């Protein structure tokens, strides 16, 4: 088993290296919705808990964490993305135990961009209605515990982006591994490869133009071909360690490195404190080059800090209700607020 795991880790690292790009490629990929974390608890740590995240939230960071679902889990989250823009994210997921060591999960994320005025060459000021882009992705995940120390998972995700007369769709895959060791499983390592798939292309009636060529008597309809665009593939490597662990308090330090194919690499860290059985406090920071010094080379609206709080509430025999809130600072805009509800049955 250790030999097979080592080979799989080496394959993920080698495959991921081929995707490692540079910031000069920023803006040349599409389907950027795949880079937005829709879940509340992990946003409170700026996503730095990829090596320790469990349950449905792991379907975004490291799918190996889904293997820790004990029976059934249902989750919902709502994000007010970049406050003031009117953009909202809604995410819904369900996971269930399959067999003795496997977990099957389904997650759906939709992104609402609000109503955008329709403008044309003849009516550049609008006044003829509005349109609403529809961005969504649906993921099917299978995760498995191979031993008491080794966990792995794979996700197939269908991606869709459209307006009324133009649409693009595609399929991508995520894979992840987690290794757990140390006293009371207090040390965890993770690696994940995300958003790997074939290029996507927009198509539809919106790419046609009807015009009458000079000297012609009849109008012609011309179809304009769109260019393909790549998906924002990345490799994520993380570690988590319980720095305090006793009957009443568990404090976990988390860290991660993200190698992005189409933007700057990122480093993140965070602390999660479980105080008793009810209260959870979270704080994190995500750094990339140029974030602290500012200037024209800043390529993200996020300024780094994140924080959150969670409450665990008993919900009957064998069931737990978890309420989470997180906030991430941005400049400009008014930050990103995320509320989440999870029920373990």
What do the predicted segments below correspond to?
Residues 10-11, 70:
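Short, linear, compositionally biased motifs with a strong N-terminal bias
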Residues 2-10:
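Sec-dependent signal peptide recognition
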Residues 19-345:
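Subset of outer-membrane beta-barrel
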């Amino acid at each position: 088993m250790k030999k097979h795991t080592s080979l799989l880790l080496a394959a993920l690292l080698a495959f991921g290296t081929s995707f490692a790009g540079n910031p000069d490629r920023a803006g040349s990929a599409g389907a950027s919705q795949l880079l937005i974390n829709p879940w509340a608890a992990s946003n409170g740590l700026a996503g730095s808990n990829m090596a320790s995240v469990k349950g449905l939230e792991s379907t975004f960071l490291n799918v190996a964490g889904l293997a820790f679902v004990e029976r059934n889990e249902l989750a919902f989250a709502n994000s007010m993305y970049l406050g003031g823009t009117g953009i909202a994210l809604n995410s819904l997921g369900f996971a269930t135990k399959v067999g003795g060591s496997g977990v099957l999960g389904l997650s759906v994320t939709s992104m609402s961009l609000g109503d955008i005025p329709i403008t044309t060459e003849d009516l550049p000021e609008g006044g003829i209605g509005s349109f609403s882009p529809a961005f969504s992705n649906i993921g099917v995940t299978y995760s498995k515990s191979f031993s008491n120390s080794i966990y792995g998972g794979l996700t197939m995700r269908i991606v869709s982006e459209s307006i009324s007369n133009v649409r693009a769709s595609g399929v991508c895959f995520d894979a992840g591994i987690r290794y757990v060791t140390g006293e009371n499983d207090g040390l965890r390592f993770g690696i994940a490869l995300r958003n790997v798939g074939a290029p996507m292309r927009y198509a539809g009636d919106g790419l046609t133009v009807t015009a009458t060529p000079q000297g012609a008597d009849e109008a012609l309809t011309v179809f304009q071909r769109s260019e393909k665009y790549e998906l924002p593939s990345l490799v994520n490597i993380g570690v988590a360690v319980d720095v305090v662990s006793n009957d009443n308090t568990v404090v976990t330090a988390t860290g991660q490195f993200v190698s992005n194919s189409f933007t700057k690499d990122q480093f993140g860290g965070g602390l999660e404190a479980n105080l008793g059985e009810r209260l959870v406090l979270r704080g994190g920071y995500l750094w990339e080059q140029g974030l602290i010094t500012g200037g024209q080379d800043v390529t993200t609206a996020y300024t780094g800090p994140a924080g959150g709080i969670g409450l665990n509430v008993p919900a009957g025999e064998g069931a737990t209700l978890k309420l989470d809130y997180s906030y991430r600072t941005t400049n400009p805009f008014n930050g990103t607020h995320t509320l989440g509800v999870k029920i373990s049955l």
